[in-house]
Curated annotation (Swiss-Prot):
GO terms for molecular function: glucosamine-1-phosphate N-acetyltransferase activity; magnesium ion binding; UDP-N-acetylglucosamine diphosphorylase activity. Residues 1-229 are annotated as: Pyrophosphorylase. Catalyzes the last two sequential reactions in the de novo biosynthetic pathway for UDP-N-acetylglucosamine (UDP-GlcNAc). The C-terminal domain catalyzes the transfer of acetyl group from acetyl coenzyme A to glucosamine-1-phosphate (GlcN-1-P) to produce N-acetylglucosamine-1-phosphate (GlcNAc-1-P), which is converted into UDP-GlcNAc by the transfer of uridine 5-monophosphate (from uridine 5-triphosphate), a reaction catalyzed by the N-terminal domain. It comes from the Bacteria. Mg(2+) binds at D103, N227. This is Bifunctional protein GlmU. The gene is glmU. GO terms for cellular component: cytoplasm; membrane. PANTHER family: BIFUNCTIONAL PROTEIN GLMU, NUCLEOTIDYL TRANSFERASE. Homotrimer. Its EC number is 2.7.7.23, 2.3.1.157.
């Protein structure tokens, strides 16, 4: 059986009050439309078409790596019109098409699989996703036959007294037999107060033709649409709860899961402990037995097992097994830190490699450098990597001891087994086995205060 999907992503999203298309706003680090695409793919649906409109180039930019096709809806004339715009995608296809909305990011791949299985096994012409709610005010009601099949969808304003009591609502997500859908679209009209083509009218057309229509009921949170910043926040809360619950089930400890913010694609190993206020973003991987103390941010990075991070920022970097970072360290992109290293307080490292067992304990800047293993950086060391025009590289070998308040003027090389005296400004290569001293001699002028009349008696 051939299965495919259409995702409606052409809405303007006026209530978002944004210059961006609604569907590219993110929920837990991923664009809403990409949540839907990815869950469709997890349900083994490979052929996906996006109906786009206002801000189409932006939507394409955010979905270009998702291997989808696009249909253009120049004018937003309703959900039925959006599907009509995708007729070319459906042309000559036989099988089943599911239709989802790009602003409902909480739909799960399990529900999508259930939708296709229910639809295909029951040989329905159409299957709706519905939900039951305590207050259905404003929603279209699902009215069922005695057999359980769907009889019709009635908009709230058109409900009679009995229909108003129904609390099963329409989600706007469907499965259709492709041939029946295309034939029904030919009879779709815009004879309504809004002058729009509604996909719900297709259900009525099918029923009038004697077709079989079913529905599956899912939790309301799965069909929540996002039309405002308030609803975006509500979706974020639901998604975050799901994400954190998944990690806890897999053996991760959260001291306070309600104040821990983890993006949907983050991977975390078991026996890792995460304290409140941590933000873990992008395609980050945290291995086993790590400890992330409060107010740390990690983005698009790999953190190996046994790492401790305290009040620090790590961006697009790799931190080796057993290393400690922080407090108040800043690890900038393209940094690779080895095993059992120590990156201490107020240390900034940018685009550099730090070897195993190296200690950079405090108040140090390292940029565009290769640093070997078992080195020690004294407090106040600066790798001076910028000459005013471009960044230069510094190379430091193994077992180098860098004294406090040292300036390493790039490009420069410090070889293995070297010492640099505190307060030095190094501009030339330091040979292996050497002690480098590059500072002015101390001069004591005896009696100077008395001569200047500054001596206090």
């Amino acid at each position: 059986m051939y299965n495919c999907a259409i995702i409606l992503a052409a809405g303007k999203g006026k209530r978002m009050k944004s210059s961006m298309p609604k569907v590219v706003h993110k929920v837990c680090g991923k664009e809403m439309v990409n949540h839907v695409i990815d869950n469709v793919r997890k349900a083994n649906i490979s052929d996906v078409n996006l109906v786009i409109g206002k801000g189409s180039e932006t939507v394409k930019e955010h979905t270009r790596d998702r291997n989808v096709t696009y249909s253009m809806q120049e004018e937003q004339l309703g959900t039925g019109h959006a599907v009509i715009c995708a007729e070319e995608f459906l042309k000559d296809k036989k099988g089943t098409v599911a239709i989802f909305t790009g602003d409902a990011p909480l739909i799960t791949n399990e529900t999508i699989q259930e939708l296709f299985e229910f639809h295909n096994s029951g040989k329905y012409a159409a299957t709706l996703i519905s939900s039951t709610v305590q207050d259905p005010t404003g929603y279209g009601r699902i009215i069922r036959e005695a057999s359980g099949e769907v009889k019709k969808i009635v908009e709230h304003k058109d409900c009679n007294e009995e229909e108003l009591k129904v609390n099963e609502i329409n989600s706007g997500m469907y499965c259709f037999d492709i041939e029946v859908l295309l034939n029904s679209l030919k009879n779709l009209n815009n004879d309504n107060s809004q002058g729009e083509y509604y996909l719900t009218d297709v259900i009525e057309i099918m029923k009038e033709s004697g077709e079989k229509v079913g529905a599956i009921v899912v939790p309301y949170e799965e069909i929540m649409g996002v039309n405002s910043r308030v609803q975006l926040s509500e979706a974020e809360i639901v998604m975050r709860k799901r994400i954190n619950h998944k990690h806890m089930v897999n053996g991760v400890t959260f001291i306070d899961c309600e104040s821990t913010y983890i993006d949907v694609d983050v991977e975390i190993g078991n026996d890792t402990i995460i304290y409140p206020g941590c933000v873990i973003q992008g395609n980050t991987t945290i291995k086993e037995e790590c400890t992330l103390y409060s107010n740390s941010r990690i983005c698009n990075s790999i953190i190996e097992s046994g790492v401790v991070v305290e009040n620090s920022v790590i961006l697009e970097s790799h931190v080796g097994e057993g290393t400690t970072v922080g407090p108040f360290a800043y690890i900038r992109p393209e940094t690779k830190i080895g095993k059992s290293a120590r990156i201490g307080d107020f240390v900034e490292i940018k685009k550099s490699t730090i070897g195993d067992n190296t200690k950079v304990s405090h108040l140090t800047y390292i940029g565009d450098a290769e640093v070997g293993s078992k080195c020690n950086f004294g407090c106040g060391t600066v790798v001076v990597n910028y000459d005013g025009q471009k960044k230069q590289k510094t190379i430091i070998g193994n077992n180098a001891f860098i004294g406090c308040n040292t300036n390493l003027i790039s490009p420069v090389k410090v070889n293995d087994n070297t010492y640099i005296a505190a307060g030095s400004t190094i501009t030339k290569e330091v040979p292996e086995g050497s002690l480098a001293i590059a500072r002015s001699k101390q001069i004591n002028k005896e009696g100077w205060l008395d001569k200047k009349g500054l001596l206090k008696k």
